[in-house]
Amino acid sequence: VVCPGFIDMHVHLREPGHEHKETVATGVAAAVAGGFTAVACMPNTSPVNDDAAITRLILLRAHQAGLARVYPVGAVSKGQAGEQLAEIGELRAAGCVAVSDDGHPVASASLMRRALEYASMFDMPVIDHCEDISLAGDGVAHEGHHAAALGLRGLPAAAEEINVERDVTLSGLTGAP
């Protein structure tokens, strides 16, 4: 099969701060080995990619590796804490293609509304982690017969559906795609 290179829309390159897990260079090398010519890297670094300087560092490391295109995803909120909006315009100017609090839901509807409004001004998508933590709790598998039979704590579908409904409604309210 011959096809164009694939794009992985959700990778964790971990640099800066967690280089013992993965660096930009090792991550893009693995991507290329698997047929991926571009990756979108999530902001869960240390420090979090919520600052233009971190974005520029990631892009510098990607340029130095020279293997695949790297598209940084900046954080929606500072420190991915869900409390204060990150400087989305500065992240865009530095090279971020989207924003996300990857792995952390934006619990505040008000903050998500502002993120959608602000990001749409820069034609940036908001990549959402839809999960109501108060419902999901410490569940590890879809709630149902199989989880119960295996003795696993269940995750109700509503834990995701509630946030999806909220954020689709906010998207309509703000006009953000």
Predicted features along the sequence, with ranges:
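Active-site environment of divalent metal-dependent phosphoester hydrolases
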Residues: 45-48, 78-79, 106-107, 133-135
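Alpha-helix-loop-beta-strand connector modules within alpha/beta enzyme cores
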Residues: 3, 52-73, 117-128, 173
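Histidine/acidic residue-rich metal-binding segments in metalloenzymes
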Residues: 85-177
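Divalent metal-coordination and catalytic microenvironments
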Residues: 10, 31, 35, 70, ...
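Active-site mouth loops of central-metabolism enzymes
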Residues: 9-22, 43-45, 71-84, 150-158
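Short, acidic/polar
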Residues: 20-28, 80-91, 166
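Metal-associated gating/positioning segment near the N- to mid-region
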Residues: 1-65
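Hydrophobic alpha-helical hairpins/lids featuring a short glycine-rich hinge
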Residues: 44, 50, 61, 65-81, ...
